Design a protein with these regions (language model features):
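Solvent-exposed adhesion/ligand-recognition segments of exported proteins
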Residues: 2-16, 21-166
């Protein structure tokens, strides 16, 4: 018995159009909603880069941010940990994080609470004061070509974090 190692399905013209349309919609969906925050955390875009105004930290310095989706495109994402305006490496001029009350985060916990896995394709930057970075997603994390700027330490965790005394 001979097994072909290269399988090439034969599609009709309408089948090829259908496949092309499906891929077009999938591509637009991935670009349209990279990061969807819940609660105090907010997201906007500047120069195609997602800017995340992280939640105000606790007295111990933990900024606990929850998301329905946490994906980073090739354009990147910036986590705003700044008390004053300045220049981001990825997004240019940014203002201070409006959620802060005089204290920056020492640990930025990014927790995905939905059924969506995370796809990290680009750089992430902690703008302002350097902090520890944690991405926790029990549904999985694919990291392909991404990096993290201005982080003291970084952890990608496939699981659900437990926070105590945070």
């Amino acid at each position: 018995m001979k097994i072909d190692t290269l399988y090439q399905p034969k599609l009709s013209a309408s089948g090829k159009v259908t496949v092309a349309v499906c891929f077009a919609f999938l591509g637009n969906a991935a670009v349209a909603a990279n990061i969807e925050a819940i609660g105090q955390t907010s997201v906007q875009q500047q120069h195609n880069v997602d800017i995340v105004n992280i939640a105000a930290p606790t007295a111990q310095g933990l900024s606990h941010n929850q998301y329905n989706k946490y994906n980073v495109s090739q354009h990147g994402a910036v986590l705003n940990n700044a008390l004053s305006a300045g220049k981001s490496q990825l997004a240019g001029n940014l203002s201070a994080n409006k959620n802060f009350q005089g204290q920056t985060a020492s640990v930025i916990l990014n927790e995905v609470v939905s059924k969506n896995p995370s796809l990290i394709l680009g750089q992430q930057e902690i703008f302002g004061i350097a902090a520890d970075y944690v991405l926790a997603n029990p549904n999985g994390i694919t990291h392909n070509g991404g990096s993290i700027l201005n982080a003291n330490r970084a952890s990608l965790i496939v699981g659900t974090p437990t926070v105590s005394d945070g």
